[in-house]
Design a protein with these regions (language model features):
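A structural signal for multi-pass alpha-helical bundles of membrane permease subunits
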Residues: 2-280
Length: 280
């Protein structure tokens, strides 16, 4: 009787998980399916299986919009995302090491200030940032999107701090005895040991920057500089008929880099989050 009850509970549990997972995946499945349909079929039926597979959507979408091929938008997104991710991860690790290992005047004060910046919505600092970067002549370039990332990001600094605090201080002392200065201790001892949290931060930042819309919208004016997220918005023109099939086709392609990064580093992502929680 108990075994039958457990089996029944297990059945309903897995049924719920499958149903919930399908609901979560349905928008993505619908987008992929719609990338093979024409406009009439996209909005005329809710079926996930196209009646006639239309591969022209990918061809038309890849031609781009506004005279700019879509490969340019992908190149811009990779350029922005990769540089911003590298700058964020390395600078955040450096700042996290400073907070976790070095004692200096006002450390707690600056740490609290850093945490407070995490609570500010981006809309609060959006206009001041634009004014500053406009006066610097950085608008309509990738500078305001990339250069600030080399100053560290509070979320990743806090995440890495928890990991570094779990490392034995004796490692630093041994390296210091061997003649290493603080920067050498960081690059040769600490940095290699925090690989799990570095990979976790890389995945998160890559995902956030690849999907970033408001930043490029605010600072990029030339279509030749547009990222994928902005380019997808350009496809929708209220003055003319919108090729929704091409939009969904390019939207499907834009998911591939994120999906590949997640699949490749999935093991490290889980490890980085779990070990950071334990060490914190």
């Amino acid at each position: 009787m108990k075994k039958a009850k457990k089996r029944l509970q297990g059945f309903f549990y897995h049924l719920f998980i499958i149903a919930f997972g399908f609901l979560m995946l349905y928008p993505i499945l619908w987008m992929v399916s719609s990338s093979f349909k024409d406009n009439l079929e996209i909005f005329g039926t809710a079926s996930l299986i196209p009646k006639n597979f239309k591969f022209d959507n990918y061809i038309n979408g890849w031609k781009g919009v506004g005279g700019v091929p879509f490969v340019v938008f992908f190149r811009n997104s990779f350029y922005y995302t990769i540089l911003a991710t590298i700058g964020t991860v390395f600078s955040s690790a450096l700042v996290a090491y400073g907070f976790a290992r070095n004692k200096f005047f006002g450390r707690k004060f600056w740490f609290v200030c850093m945490l407070l910046t995490m609570m500010l919505p981006y809309q609060v600092v959006m206009i001041p940032q634009f004014i500053i970067f406009f006066k610097l002549g950085w608008v309509n370039s990738f500078k305001p999107l990339i250069i600030p990332m080399f100053a560290g990001q509070p979320f990743f600094i806090f995440l890495m701090m928890q990991f570094i605090r779990g490392l034995p201080i004796e490692l630093d002392e041994s390296a210091k005895i061997d003649g290493c200065n603080r920067f050498q201790i960081f690059t040769r001892v600490i940095f290699p040991l925090i690989t799990p949290v570095l990979i976790t931060s890389t995945i998160f930042q890559f995902y956030w920057k690849w999907d970033d819309f408001i930043g490029p919208l605010l600072f990029l004016n030339s279509p030749k500089l547009y990222t994928v997220s902005l380019a997808l918005r350009m496809f929708s023109d209220p003055m003319t008929s919108t090729d929704w099939g091409a939009i969904f086709a390019m939207g499907t392609l834009s998911l591939l880099p994120i999906l590949l990064v997640f699949l490749i580093f999935q093991k490290h992502l889980v490890e980085g989050i779990s070990t950071t929680g334990l060490k914190g």
